[in-house]
Swiss-Prot record:
Keyword check for Nuclease: yes
Organism: Cricetulus griseus
Region (Leucine-zipper): 177-198
Localization annotation: Cytoplasm; Nucleus
Subunit structure of this chain's protein: Ring-shaped heterooctamer of six TSN and two TSNAX subunits, DNA/RNA binding occurs inside the ring.
Protein role: DNA-binding protein that specifically recognizes consensus sequences at the breakpoint junctions in chromosomal translocations, mostly involving immunoglobulin (Ig)/T-cell receptor gene segments. Seems to recognize single-stranded DNA ends generated by staggered breaks occurring at recombination hot spots.
Family label: Belongs to the translin family.
InterPro entries linked: Translin (IPR033956), Translin_C (IPR016069), Translin_fam (IPR002848), Translin_N (IPR016068), Translin_sf (IPR036081)
Protein name according to UniProt: Translin
Protein's UniProt keywords contain Nuclease: yes
Modified residues (N6-acetyllysine): 187, 199
An annotated GO cellular component: male germ cell nucleus
Pfam families, A to Z: Translin
PTM-bearing positions, type Phosphoserine: 190
């Protein structure tokens, strides 16, 4: 094979990969659009009357996750399953965002942390790497950390809306998250930076709870703070 033939062959490989990446980008753009729609829907809980609409907003968000499943099913067909991490960078951030949105819905519904397995059911993907398109553990953890930041904001807006017990529940939840993350030996630099922000979320919520206890707005809050 001549030098020119070698490079012609290589160009064929490069062109084929570029085609794959372009197809992936198209699906990811659709995923990002749907994620924005879900986020806009859920952001409404921060408004004055938003707390009354939580069940309705969560139900609507779950309907949007049906569209997410469709997009992810399409994404799976765009590349060989064994090359997941070769193209992972294309969908990593939107997948983390979708984990956060799924976790936010579950928290608003039950005030519990969604498991990685439950997220994969919501998104219609696999929990295990061996089964193909899956939810990477670090992507799951990143989404959970985004949730913590969102909940710290929610604690402040809860007070504005006159819901004085919610910040206490959020404080308990975020402190449990913090304790859980302390058990992990995080090697990923991006994930570690996100985790560094968790302590600020914890502090922000604790300040809200403390302020409520000082002002006597909530007996449950005051009693809990008195036990510390």
């Amino acid at each position: 094979m001549s030098v020119s033939e070698i490079f012609v062959e290589l160009q064929g490989f490069l062109a084929a990969e570029q085609d794959i990446r372009e197809e992936i980008r198209k699906v990811v753009q659709s995923l990002e659009q749907t994620a924005r729609e879900i986020l806009t829907l859920l952001q409404g809980v921060h408004q004055g009357t938003g707390f009354q609409d939580i069940p309705k907003r969560c139900l609507k968000a779950r309907e949007h996750f049906g569209t997410v499943k469709t997009h992810l099913t399409s994404l799976k067909t765009k590349f060989p399953a064994e090359q997941y991490y070769r193209f992972h960078e294309h969908w990593r951030f939107v997948l983390q965002r979708l984990v956060f949105l799924a976790a936010f819905v579950v928290y608003l519904e039950t005030e519990t942390l969604v498991t990685r397995e439950a997220v994969t059911e919501i998104l219609g993907i696999e929990p295990d790497r061996e089964k193909g398109f899956h939810l990477d553990v670090e992507d799951y953890l990143s989404g959970v950390l985004i949730l913590a930041s969102e909940l710290s904001r929610l604690s402040v807006n809860s007070v504005t809306a006159g819901d004085y017990s919610r910040p206490l529940h959020i404080s308990t939840f975020i402190n449990e998250l913090d304790s859980g993350f302390r058990l992990l030996n995080l090697k990923n630099d991006s994930l570690r930076k996100r985790y560094d922000g968790l302590k600020y979320d914890v502090k922000k919520v604790e300040e809200v709870v403390y302020d409520l206890s000082i002002r006597g707005f909530n007996k449950e809050t005051a009693a809990a703070c008195g036990e510390k």
